[in-house]
Amino acid sequence: MAEVSAKSVTVEEMAEEDDAAIEERWSLYEAYNELHALAQELETPFEAPAVLVVGQQTDGKSALVEALMGFQFNHVGGGTKTRRPITLHMKYDPQCQFPLCHLGSDDDPSVSLPKSLSQIQAYIEAENMRLEQEPCSPFSAKEIIVKVQYKYCPNLTIIDTPGLIAPAPGLKNRALQVQARAVEALVRAKMQHKEFIILCLEDSSDWSIATTRRIVMQVDPELSRTIVVSTKLDTKIPQFSCSSDVEVFLSPPASALDSSLLGDSPFFTSVPSGRVGYGQDSVYKSNDEFKQAVSLREMEDIASLEKKLGRLLTKQEKSRIGISKLRLFLEELLWKRYKESVPLIIPLLGKEYRSTVRKLDTVSKELSSLDEAKLKERGRTFHDLFLTKLSLLLKGTVVAPPDKFGETLQDERTQGGAFVGTDGLQFSHKLIPNAGMRLYGGAQYHRAMAEFRFLVGAIKCPPITREEIVNACGVEDIHDGTNYSRTACVIAVAKARETFEPFLHQLGARLLHILKRLLPISVYLLQKEGEYLSGHEVFLKRVASAFNSFVESTEKSCRDKCMEDLASTTRYVTWSLHNKNRAGLRQFLDSFGGTEHNTTSGNAIGFSLPQDALGGTTDTKSRSDVKLSHLASNIDSGSSIQTTEMRLADLLDSTLWNRKLAPSSERIVYALVQQIFQGIREYFLASAELKFNCFLLMPIVDKLPALLREELENAFEDDLDSIFDITNLRQSLDQKKRSTEIELRRIKRIKEKFRVMNEKLNSHEFAQNLKAPSVQH
């Protein structure tokens, strides 16, 4: 009797130990389920291990999920109806005769409401219809979370994603092509989570066709965390004509399927057709019958394969065939990942807990500072810090990331406008130093000025036509002769104003764009240092409006000053200013005078203009005069006087009395226009750069602080509640404080669960009890 009693005690103890192990496993599953919900809500960096199901619409994805669950969920149907991922937290409960389901709240994922299968199905269908009506975002990455307890459920977390679409090419299928890209982007984003095990479904008897693997391998190239599943095995077996085809299908070569995939080789599954219900179209009366049909289908598949092969399947081959084998493998794998991840998740939860504590402290401090004196002081402090950041950006800094805030010259031209001449052409941006670098602040301002100098300094005088010269001659108020010096001035100033005025407006727009960019960069620097007035949008908008208005008005004022300079230098020609390169003009006219010939009476006679007509001194002889003097030395004085008079008459005839434009007159006008245009260009370039530096850049440094301070004090004199929106802000902060406190308690509770679980996993006694789930579902 004593022996029997001892044996009874031993059996009872073993049963208690098994129950304890199962209970601890369930506790760990629950902790991970809570962690997964928390990660979805807060978008935290940690994720719980889960199985992500990926497949085409026609791969039997929904049927496979139902077979793994042990009951028909019927949440999709035909076509593209799953538009949000569905997370199924499944828990094995032998006492649960019917599926017990809870639906996670979209507003608070920590809250799960008990729902029937029909209610959950109705909710999912309503969500799908809602998203289908939104053309801009027909799919959503936010998961629908469902918790299920059932006697046939495995202990798994499965995320069922929308089915991938393979649309036909052509314009008429454009809408479906857009949907296909949206689904693929959603699925690819889900696969990025390194903790997820990817269940890749393929419906093909040829492993060289990688419909779903093509997308999966973009994220997991080696398939190291991917389980490949060949679905609809029962329909493929009859397609094989010989045993060798079956051998290749069951054991694909490395050239067709990478051997590094998770599980070493693919799984093969079949799910019997037919729905559970009491209608005429129903095949199964209950989920128990459906479960039995799944098991029977598995045995039939093995028998059919053995018949095709002409041999019995090995133990290794059988371990890859059927829903039950796939479910057991997933459970063991997920359980292993759960245990391995516990020590890694604890520090992440600790970090998130400390971050939430700091967030709560910040909210509490903001609530305590909502009085007039403190708000005014914070506003003045923000003013000083904002100006400090502006000055820092102009002087140069590397604190703001160039990849986020910098602009290349091409970007700058696109956003702020390009320098374009009257011909509509642009210089290549590659000719400008640092064109490919992403700059901001003072460095970007300097590059824009350098581009302006480079482009304007290289501008040549536009072509001059004979018609323009003749039209510019006109008629004087006292005589009808021609004045080619006036003609040259009229043409030069008109060409200069037409050429340079657009560049002035373009320079103003470009520099205005660069200076306005200082505002968001300064805000970023303040946020980075924790000095940003978060929640005070009305006040911040007022500061931003004052800054932008100041920059815009200052740029306009500066541009008006530059326009006055351009108007003055193109209204009246001052020879000492405009004719900068008189030596070049003399050289041009000297060569002209030495080569110009008059063939009248067979005598070769050259002529030159007096020096004072060219703006030079009268005591300096030109080379043409020297040549003429040398020519006249062999002629008697009477002949010399006669020749000089003839030359003077010819000169007056060609430049004063004759309206027929001679080549000599045309060349003189062209030379004068070139010199005047060059003088205007040099003056315009120096004046514009100097004025933009003095009257646009410098006011940012020395006038903006006083203006912002005045704007700030005026704002304080107004209704302070309207400026800082104290009432709404207090309500918002109170709500934020309550939600942060709830979040903190949730993190603390989950953190404590994982801490206790980690201690038990590390204990020798618990390690002996915790084995892979051995419950037969």
From Swiss-Prot:
Transmembrane segments: none annotated. One of its GO terms (cellular component) is chloroplast. Residues 231-234 are annotated as: G4 motif. GTPase activity is repressed by PDV2 thus increasing stability at the plastid outer envelope membranes (OEMs) periphery. Gene3D superfamilies: P-loop containing nucleotide triphosphate hydrolases. Residues 265-268 are annotated as: G5 motif. The keyword Lipid biosynthesis does not apply. InterPro entries: Dynamin, Dynamin_GTPase, Dynamin_N, G_DYNAMIN_dom, P-loop_NTPase. Residues 160-163 are annotated as: G3 motif. SUPFAM superfamilies: P-loop containing nucleoside triphosphate hydrolases. The keyword Transferase does not apply. It is an enzyme of class 3 (hydrolase). It catalyses: GTP + H2O = GDP + phosphate + H(+). GTP binds at residues 55-62, 160-164, 231-234. GO terms for biological process: chloroplast fission; circadian rhythm; peroxisome fission; response to gibberellin. GO terms for molecular function: GTP binding; GTPase activity; identical protein binding. Residues 300-320, 728-765 form a coiled coil. Mechanochemical GTPase component of both plastid and peroxisome division machinery. Required for the last steps of plastid division specifically in mesophyll-cell, when the narrow isthmus breaks, facilitating the separation of the daughter plastids. Necessary for peroxisome activities. Seems to influence stromule (stroma-filled tubular extensions of the plastid envelope membrane) length and frequency. Forms a homodimer and heterodimers with DRP3A and DRP3B on peroxisomes. Also interacts with FIS1A (but not FIS1B) and PEX11 proteins (PEX11A, PEX11B, PEX11C, PEX11D and PEX11E) on peroxisomes. Interacts with PDV1 and PDV2. This is Dynamin-like protein ARC5. It comes from Arabidopsis thaliana (Mouse-ear cress).
